[in-house]
Amino acid sequence: MAKINEEQVRHVAHLARLAVTDEEVQQFTVQLEKILGFAEQLNELDTTGIEPTTHVLDLKNVLRKDEVRPSLPRTEVERLAPDWEDGQVRVPAVFE
């Protein structure tokens, strides 16, 4: 059975920017081990003769034809943007 430790849970929580308590880390460690155990049961299935799939339903993406259409004038975009710098919209940093 797959093992997951508290350090791994803390690492994933950090990546997801989640603040977790020591109690939550212990709880999530147990829960994630159970989830991984259920997923490992799939390895026991005999899939001989079954074609691999990426989607359960055979759905197709419907795309429209690209058409050139007028957009907002640059002056309007500048007026609507919260911050503008060197000809580009300035946004808050996403990554540290």
UniProtKB/Swiss-Prot annotation:
EC number(s) from the headed UniProt entry: 6.3.5.-
Any one Pfam family match given in the protein's UniProt record, by short name: GatC
Coiled coil: none
UniProtKB keywords: ATP-binding, Ligase, Nucleotide-binding, Protein biosynthesis
Catalysed reactions, as listed in the record: L-glutamyl-tRNA(Gln) + L-glutamine + ATP + H2O = L-glutaminyl-tRNA(Gln) + L-glutamate + ADP + phosphate + H(+); L-aspartyl-tRNA(Asn) + L-glutamine + ATP + H2O = L-asparaginyl-tRNA(Asn) + L-glutamate + ADP + phosphate + 2 H(+)
Gene3D superfamilies: Glu-tRNAGln amidotransferase C subunit, N-terminal domain
Origin: domain of life: Bacteria
Protein biosynthesis in keyword set: yes
GO MF entry, a single one: ATP binding
Subunit structure: Heterotrimer of A, B and C subunits.
Its job: Allows the formation of correctly charged Asn-tRNA(Asn) or Gln-tRNA(Gln) through the transamidation of misacylated Asp-tRNA(Asn) or Glu-tRNA(Gln) in organisms which lack either or both of asparaginyl-tRNA or glutaminyl-tRNA synthetases. The reaction takes place in the presence of glutamine and ATP through an activated phospho-Asp-tRNA(Asn) or phospho-Glu-tRNA(Gln).
UniProt similarity note: Belongs to the GatC family.
HAMAP family: GatC (MF_00122)
Protein name as it appears in the record: Aspartyl/glutamyl-tRNA(Asn/Gln) amidotransferase subunit C
UniProt source species: Exiguobacterium sibiricum (strain DSM 17290 / CCUG 55495 / CIP 109462 / JCM 13490 / 255-15)
The organism's taxonomic lineage, starting at the top: Bacteria, Bacillati, Bacillota, Bacilli, Bacillales
